[in-house]
UniProtKB/Swiss-Prot annotation:
Keywords: Ribonucleoprotein, Ribosomal protein, RNA-binding, rRNA-binding. Belongs to the universal ribosomal protein uL10 family. The keyword Lipoprotein does not apply. CDD domains: Ribosomal_L10. GO terms for biological process: translation. The gene is rplJ. The lineage of its organism: Bacteria, Pseudomonadati, Chlorobiota, Chlorobiia, Chlorobiales. One of its GO terms (molecular function) is structural constituent of ribosome. It comes from the Bacteria. It holds the Pfam family Ribosomal_L10. PANTHER family: 39S RIBOSOMAL PROTEIN L10, MITOCHONDRIAL. InterPro entries: Ribosomal_uL10 (IPR001790), Ribosomal_uL10-like_sf (IPR043141), Ribosomal_uL10_bac (IPR022973), Ribosomal_uL10_bac_type (IPR047865), Ribosomal_uL10_CS_bac (IPR002363). Forms part of the ribosomal stalk, playing a central role in the interaction of the ribosome with GTP-bound translation factors. This is Large ribosomal subunit protein uL10.
Length: 173
């Protein structure tokens, strides 16, 4: 590969990594073309990009990424990068699920907002709630609070009316 082509790949990958909220390194050696296409499709559905490049080029691209120096330690054998732009947890869920069915896909390391996670932390990451799940839970909690406010106001008003009625009855007697 010509030097200009390599430099362009490094530049493109570096731009993607700068935008990423989560970067996951995987080993895919032994995955056939059909399984790789299936994996890429799963990533695409979740808004995650899966990129394969030479380790030396990935290492160059990681130089300006927060936590990239430690992530570079995982660049051995074949390396694929799952890049999560909107949801840093989505790649972990897909890698965990897909890896259970296909043992050839192995999680190496990940970085989320500068924090580096080793291979043994994949299950922890995959069980975390995604951004959309967290937003959904928060919206549900807000909805409960908002729907409770009228009930509380009605209860207070009812109690107030009852107290006023009792005071009025006492004054009449």
């Amino acid at each position: 590969m010509k030097r200009e082509k390599k430099e362009q790949i490094v530049k493109d990958v570096a731009e993607k990594l700068q935008k990423a909220q989560g970067i996951y390194l995987t080993e895919f050696q032994g995955l056939d073309v059909e399984k790789m296409a299936e994996l890429r499709n799963e990533f695409r559905k979740a808004g995650v990009e899966y990129q394969v490049a030479k380790n030396t080029l990935i290492k160059k691209a990681l130089e300006n990424v927060n936590g990239g120096d430690r992530l570079a330690d995982g660049l051995v054998n074949t390396t694929g990068m799952a890049i999560g732009y909107d949801d840093p947890i989505a790649p972990a869920k897909i890698i965990e699920k897909f890896g259970k069915k296909n043992e050839m896909l192995k999680f190496k390391m990940a970085t989320i907002d500068g924090s580096v996670f080793e291979a043994d932390k994949l299950q922890v990451l995959s069980k975390m709630l995604s951004k959309t799940e967290n937003i959904g839970r928060f919206a549900g909690m807000l909805n409960n609070v908002i729907s409770s406010v009228p009930m509380v106001i009605n209860a207070v008003m009812s109690d107030l009316v009852s107290v006023i009625d009792q005071v009025a009855k006492q004054k009449q007697d």
